[in-house]
Amino acid sequence: MCGIVGYIGKKEAAPILVEGLSKLEYRGYDSAGVAIIEDQVIRTRKCKGRLVNLEEKLNEESMIGDIGIGHTRWATHGEPSDKNSHPHNNEKGTISVVHNGIIENYIELREWLTSEGYKFVSETDTEVLPHLIDYYYKGDLLEAVMTAISKVEGSYAIGVVCSEEPDKVVAVRKDSPLIVGLGEEEYFIASDIPAVLNHTRDIYLLKDNEFVLMTKDGVKLFDKEGKEIKREIYHVTWNADAAEKGGYDHFMLKEIHEQPKVIKDTMTSRIMLGKDIKLDNIEISKEQMEKINKIYIVACGTAYHAGLVGKYTIEKLARIPVEVDIASEFRYKNPIIDKDTLMIVISQSGETADTLAALREAKKKGARVIAVTNVVGSSISREADDILYTWAGPEIAVASTKAYETQLVAMYILALYFAQEKGTLNKEELEELKEEMLSIPDKAEKCLETDEIMKKLASKTHMKKDMFFLGRGLDYAVALEGSLKLKEISYIHSEAYAAGELKHGPIALIEEGTIVITLATQEELFDKTVSNIKEVTTRGAKAIGIAFEGQKNMDKAVEEAIYIPKTKSIFAPLLSVIPLQLYSYYVSLEKGCDVDKPRNLAKSVTVE
């Protein structure tokens, strides 16, 4: 969740580091800092809070140097504070380290280093690293880092500089993302590609346990045995301005409005009328499909909600039993998996720590794994057997919108593909579903026209302390996502329930004026859902309903009805979520919250 940037070249390092860190703000952070080598001395500036605080500090106490490392920290060990911010230095101030991840054996290492005379000034796990590297340093920084890392247990992406070797940056990764940027006589390390895109499009994608040595002459990669590695350069084709706001007030609003396009992009070349579905990076034969007796879908947060839609859709169309698990729970329950199990992992970043751990657990037990991810070359995409990329483009706002939509599209593509390969749908049925799916981008565009309605609704309801979301079947999965969006960015306590469960407890929470938002797009369940709405309105709730155009009965059941274009009920989640995203956005705006960077949250959760 932290962001790392490192630089060596001919330019001033400080502004490049700060600019790079600003491109990683979406990852979430509570403090920031840089270390620059100036006249063979490491100068460190760091502080709690936003990057603007660090920039003010740098303006007051400028640093001149063409080599350095920078960091935005998300607290895991030790509170957010200046002393706990990175970079961390050894006592002599000759070695400086930035780190993303968790050192699991830091207590043992700290006790041992303390017994060796080292003094600690922070509460972080990271501070063991500069002391450990110092302990093993004998004039060769790369060798010292390699030896120190061999003593470390946990996950890490690390950048190191040393004033005694002022022409080097050393880095290493394990279970935490790190890339190398290859510029014109300048080189970079970073947690993610956007940090270097203003300077280069050529990068190395590092694998676990690989070390980097950057000098002004170039970059060398090594394995943990010290053997040099050759790596193909990956050329980034998307533009840096893809991560800009494009005239919208916030990234989140921009990304909501990009959804019709990214839905279409994710379907392109995969869903075509009159042609079989062919997926470039999935190589499951018909024979292998026949042997699959169970599917696990594993994900976290919003991606988990996409997985719930995937379960319903795959079971309905392909008739394969599907279980959906939260990744952080899955890996500890000793799941029943074998070679005839298929696992689908969903992660926008492709670096979600719990999802990656679940993937590895499944592979250990012999399962085949399909990754659904938005990031080419991410850890999850490299370790899975098959990949279905979601073409959402960079998503900057912490609260996911367009990435969620493309994850839903991926679930529908897989469901149709499995049905095609297993023969559970005939050609006419497949063509009918594909034709309807291809109409979704235009219908999603129409859903954006609810903007003004949701804005007015937000202005009337943003002061409420509690809200509830209801739905049945696929509507329940969307209710969960709508509730999560609201609590993520507006900090309003919100819960989602299967509408039929109301009478089993949740109805006790309904009182005069309670806001209840109900989705009613599943036609076979519409009447039952309306009955549930009546149960809450008779107890004083203010009901808001989302239904298809033409469902005029909704007007009579709720105080405010929002209508979306009609589609087949199975595809409703792609449309019904859009008004809920807009509502959450405008409630957050009314409350004066930080829409793109909500408190306590990070975009990419790369620690367990």
Curated annotation (Swiss-Prot):
UniProt-recorded Gene Ontology molecular function terms: carbohydrate derivative binding; glutamine-fructose-6-phosphate transaminase (isomerizing) activity
Record protein name field: Glutamine--fructose-6-phosphate aminotransferase [isomerizing]
The gene coding this protein: glmS
EC number: 2.6.1.16
SUPFAM superfamilies in the record: N-terminal nucleophile aminohydrolases (Ntn hydrolases), SIS domain
Coiled-coil regions listed: none
Organism superkingdom: Bacteria
Boundaries of every SIS domain copy: 284-424, 453-598
Lipid biosynthesis found in the keyword field: no
